């Protein structure tokens, strides 16, 4: 402990510059703690130590250390953002975005009232039996929020352990039966994908403005417009509407693409194709959810075919437990994949340096 304390002291004093009459210490600290340090220095040294804040210059942006700090609702979702390298100071903390969209995608995929109730009970158990801030407590909180979305989408889909609600409780979908309405579910998934990706591209343009790179911001906004035009053209192609004419849209794309190619080279059309591929990836929301409802229906059918109510409950219970296990694992993995690969690639700049304040080592 003594050796660690001495090493910490030497690391801190290595940044100090001293003369016979004065000393200078330079370092980083959180902006909201500057006033407290100023008051502490005045109290301890009666104004003989001067604290000066310096503006962060553009050339120093990559050197600024990063500390993730999120309020109550978003804090548990740091278990996902910490799986990634830290974002750079000029980028964004991805935690709030994960906190907003991960439970939504999770609920869209699982979407079952019965499964949501079980997950809510499990989340309550984890949150109650583990100290706040620990891994399992945070998992419980994330699971609880995701379970609420699962309940909401379960009501919209009319699912209670698959089709058990329809058979026993006369439960019907508020929105649509995703086990039968495959095309509407595909359209819904792609719509969510378009909104998610466009948000990411908008954040990417704003990030370039924060770095004082207006040219790059304009290029990203132009690509955003190209994606919107392409999506509208595809909608008009597959679902012709009187108000949506594909001709002017294709002309606009034809005018915009040469401008992007002049600015970005041949990477511009490839980036457009890549972005469309990112959007298509959201079809997995429909595919995984469809598999989940089919497995739930199979569990109910096999349970009903046994001829014995106790054996049927046992068989159906085992199969539903297996489906629930898959129903937690698959939505988690694929929701995170949609964030890490499709969404964050549009704006998140990773590789930040962790903020490590000077302090005595903990015993």
Briefly describe each language-model feature range:
Residues 1-37:
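Coiled-coil termination/hinge junctions
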Residues 26, 35-363:
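Conserved, carboxylate-rich catalytic/transport cores that coordinate ions
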């Amino acid at each position: 402990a003594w050796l660690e304390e001495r090493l910490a002291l030497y690391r801190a004093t290595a940044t100090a510059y001293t003369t016979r009459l004065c000393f200078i210490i330079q370092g980083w600290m959180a902006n909201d703690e500057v006033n407290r340090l100023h008051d502490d220095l005045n109290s301890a040294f009666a104004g003989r130590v001067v604290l000066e804040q310096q503006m962060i210059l553009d050339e120093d942006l990559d050197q600024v250390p990063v500390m993730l700090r999120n309020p109550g609702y978003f804090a548990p979702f740091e278990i996902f953002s910490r799986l990634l390298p830290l974002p750079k100071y000029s980028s964004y903390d991805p935690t709030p975005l994960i906190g907003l969209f991960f439970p939504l995608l999770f609920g869209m995929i699982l979407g079952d009232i019965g499964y949501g109730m079980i997950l809510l009970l499990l989340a309550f158990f984890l949150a109650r039996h583990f100290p706040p801030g620990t891994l399992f407590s945070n998992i419980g909180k994330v699971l609880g929020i995701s379970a609420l979305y699962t309940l909401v989408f379960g009501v919209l889909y009319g699912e209670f352990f698959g089709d058990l609600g329809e058979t026993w409780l006369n439960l019907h979908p508020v929105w649509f039966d995703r086990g039968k309405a495959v095309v509407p579910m595909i359209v819904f998934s792609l719509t969510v994908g378009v909104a998610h990706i466009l948000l990411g591209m908008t954040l990417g343009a704003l990030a370039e403005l924060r770095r004082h790179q207006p040219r790059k911001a304009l290029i990203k906004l132009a690509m955003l417009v190209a994606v919107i035009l392409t999506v509208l053209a595809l909608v008009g192609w597959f679902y012709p509407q009187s108000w949506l004419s594909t001709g002017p849209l294709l002309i606009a794309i034809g005018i915009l693409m040469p401008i992007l190619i002049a600015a970005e080279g041949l990477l511009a059309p490839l980036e457009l194709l890549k972005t469309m591929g990112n959007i298509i990836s959201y079809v997995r929301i429909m595919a995984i959810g469809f598999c989940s409802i089919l497995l739930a229906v199979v569990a109910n059918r096999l349970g009903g075919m046994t001829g014995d109510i106790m054996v049927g409950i046992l068989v159906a219970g085992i199969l539903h437990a297996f489906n629930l296990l898959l129903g937690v694992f698959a939505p988690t993995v694929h929701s995170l994949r949609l964030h890490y690969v499709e969404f964050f690639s549009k704006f998140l700049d990773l590789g930040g340096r962790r903020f490590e304040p000077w302090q005595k080592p903990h015993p």
